[in-house]
Design a protein with these regions (language model features):
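N-terminal anchoring/stem segment of glycosyltransferases
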Residues: 1-92, 115-118, 169-172, 247-254, ...
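A structural signal for well-ordered alpha-helical segments within the folded catalytic domains
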Residues: 16-19, 104-108, 198-206
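Short beta-alpha junction loops
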Residues: 39-44, 129, 155-156
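Short, well-ordered beta-to-alpha junction loops that form the rim of enzyme active sites
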Residues: 41, 127, 223-225
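Short acidic-hydrophobic catalytic motif
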Residues: 95
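GT-A fold catalytic core of metal-dependent nucleotide-sugar glycosyltransferases
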Residues: 98, 102-152
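Conserved catalytic core of nucleotide-sugar-dependent glycosyltransferases
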Residues: 132-201
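Catalytic core and acceptor-binding pocket of nucleotide-sugar-dependent glycosyltransferases
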Residues: 170-274
């Protein structure tokens, strides 16, 4: 089974965490797993032949078109529309929930990789990930069961954690999910903007619900097991935490998840105990 990891970042974060992600991937992830990285206005450095660095602006024309159409439209850039604001008095000010343009960088990288990678699985991994321990092929593959069409981080009733997910490109349901996922972005006015929120995780969840209704018996691997407590930081509290850290929010400036409530599951890996 072949596996290709996909990620993207832009110039402002290269020195903060982007280059560190590339270095940790090269050092700790099995040599049989590839990385396809879309870099925007920056030049990450690596001598690792399995890491392919692409110019995001050149390789993602659909993303460019999306930004051209929606880049100056307030509702697509974090400004909650009045009709939603009226029924969301507690969270309308949380701009990330309606910032479609910001999070489109992630999804269009996935769409492009799915079309151009000759691989069995594509795995999205946020670039604010740090691979802290050796992650061999068998361990990585264990999160991607061959019979499953999707591996993801569920959070119960909340939208999934989309810092890590895998799609089986050899499974027709996985391909249908990708097709629908891209469709709601390519036809955004009647797609994502008909939803209640339009950050990538919410859109992912809406498409996932639709596909699950259509194929209720097709296997999916929920890596997190629907964590109820600590659902804000599920990656490090799942099996993935033995290998990677996810530097969400202001953890990026610290370089490690070290908040008191980050780990709800005791870990004995040296990265976490030192």
């Amino acid at each position: 089974m072949t596996i290709t990891v996909v990620s993207t970042f832009h110039a402002p974060v290269l020195s903060l965490y982007g280059q560190r992600f590339v270095n940790s991937f090269s050092e700790n992830i099995d040599a049989d797993i590839k990385l396809r990285l879309y870099a925007e206005d920056c030049n990450p450095v690596t001598k690792d032949p399995r890491i392919q660095i692409l110019d995001a602006k050149q390789k993602l024309p659909k993303l460019n078109a999306f930004k051209s159409t929606w880049g100056n439209v307030p509702k697509a850039n974090g400004k909650c529309p009045p009709e939603i604001k009226a029924r969301r008095p507690k969270d309308w000010h949380k701009e990330f929930k309606w910032d479609a343009v910001r999070f489109a960088n992630k999804v269009y990288a996935v769409f492009d990789a799915a079309q151009h990678c000759n691989t069995d699985w594509i795995v999205w991994m946020d670039a604010d990930t740090f691979v802290h321990s050796k992650f061999d092929y068998a361990a990585f593959k264990s999160f991607l069961p061959e019979r499953s069409w999707l591996a993801y981080m569920g959070r119960g009733r909340k939208w999934p954690e989309c810092g890590f997910y895998g799609i089986n490109l050899k499974n027709p349901v996985g391909l249908e999910f990708l097709k629908e996922f891209e469709h709601v972005y390519e036809h955004a006015e009647y797609g994502i903007f008909r939803m209640e929120e339009w950050h990538d995780s919410y859109v992912f969840d809406e498409v996932l619900k639709k596909i699950k209704r259509k194929y209720p018996n097709e296997p999916i691997n929920n890596i997190s097991g629907n964590l109820v407590n600590g659902e804000g930081h599920p990656i490090i509290n799942s099996g993935l935490g033995a290998y990677i850290d996810h530097l969400k929010g202001d953890r990026k400036s610290v370089g490690k998840s070290n908040k008191p409530k980050d780990l709800i599951k005791p870990r004995n890996e040296s990265y976490w105990t030192n």
